Amino acid sequence: GLPVCGETCFTGTCYTNGCTCDPWPVCTRN
């Protein structure tokens, strides 16, 4: 979902707590 986390996740992993790689390759708060 949104808002974005300011992180990209080309590897499929988000390192920011509470963020998911959706939609790839952008990390968003779930």
UniProtKB/Swiss-Prot annotation:
InterPro entries: Cyclotide (IPR005535), Cyclotide_moebius_CS (IPR012324), Cyclotide_sf (IPR036146). Keywords: Cytolysis, Disulfide bond, Hemolysis, Knottin, Plant defense. One of its GO terms (biological process) is defense response. Pfam families: Cyclotide (PF03784). It comes from the Eukaryota. Belongs to the cyclotide family. Moebius subfamily. Probably participates in a plant defense mechanism. Has hemolytic activity. The presence of a 'disulfide through disulfide knot' structurally defines this protein as a knottin. This is Leaf cyclotide 2. It comes from Viola hederacea. The lineage of its organism: Eukaryota, Viridiplantae, Streptophyta, Embryophyta, Tracheophyta.
